[in-house]
Amino acid sequence: STHGINWDVGYPYVNKAAFQTLRDDWGANAVRLAMYTSEYNGYCSGGNQAQLRNQIYKGVKYATELGMYVIIDWHILNDGNPMTQLAQAKKFFATMSNKYKNQKNVIYEICNEPNGCSWTSIKSYATQVIKVIRKYDKKAIIVVGTPTWSQLGSDGTHNEVANSPIKGYKNIMYSLHFYANEWSHNKYLPAKLDYARKKGIAVMVTEFGMSAAGGGGGINSSYTGKWLGKLNKYNISYFCWSLSNKNESCSLLSSKTKKTSKWKTTELSVAGRYIRSKYRARKEARSEEHTSELQSPLNLVCRLL
C-alpha cells in the first residue's frame, strides 16, 4: 500500500518504475492507492479533487500496464463514520466505476477504517455505495471496511460482520487490518478471522503493518511471520503499510532513501527488508506449487499479495 497519495510521503511512489520494482524484485502482484478523505489535503477536506483523481488514474494505468491488480482506497480514518462522506463517496465511485467498468484488475475499497460507529451504519453506507458501483461495474470486487478500524466487528470478540453480511450482491469482501506489534490484534483477530471463514464471508487484508497501529515504535517480526503464514495458508490477500520513506518503523523504505524505485536492500527499512523477503519467498512457493496448474481468474484473485 502507498501512504496517503495526498502527501509527499505517498504520491512520489505512484510511478511505473516503483510498481515494476515491487512486481519484479519483491514478487508483488497488486498495489493499493490510499487516498485520505479527511486531514490535510484530504479529498473531502479541501484537497484538490481533480489532482487527487489524477493520481488514482496514473496509479491504475501503471498497475494495468504491468499486469497488476490495483485497489482504489477511499481512506476513511479520522472521519470515523463513512456516512459523513456518503455524498462525496457516491460521486467518486460513480466516476471510478464508470471509467474502469471494462477492467478486471481494479478493486474498490469503499471505506478504509471505520471507527466510532456501528456495523449497521457502515452497512447502510456500503449498500448505497455498492449500488452506485454496480450501476456501472457489475462484477468488480468491492471491499467493505469493518468496525473498529477494520477488525471485523466492534472490539475484541464481536462478530457483527460475519453474523450479518451484506445481502443481494456478489463479489463483496470485507477488510481485516492488523498491526503485528499490537497485543490485542494478535490476541483477538486470528479467532475473528477463523469465525468469518467458518461463516463463509470473504476477507481481504487491505492493510497490515509490522509496528503498532500508530506506525511507530518497535516492529514485531515474530507475529508478522505468524500472521503471514496464516494468510498464505488460507489464500488471503494482504497489503503492507506502507511504501514510503516517512520516518516511522512501519515504512518499507529507509527515511534516508530518496529514490522512488529500484531500491537496493540497503535502501529499505528493517521492515522493508523483512517484507521483501517474505513476498519473494511466497512468490517462489506459489510458482513451484502451481507450475502445472492453469490459474483461473478466481485463483489469481485469491492469491493477491
What are these regions, as identified by a protein language model?
Residues 40-42, 81, 117-120, 215, ...:
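Short, function-defining helix-loop hinge/capping sites that tune catalysis or transport
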Residues 4, 8-13, 86, 90-98, ...:
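Extracellular glycoside hydrolase catalytic/binding regions
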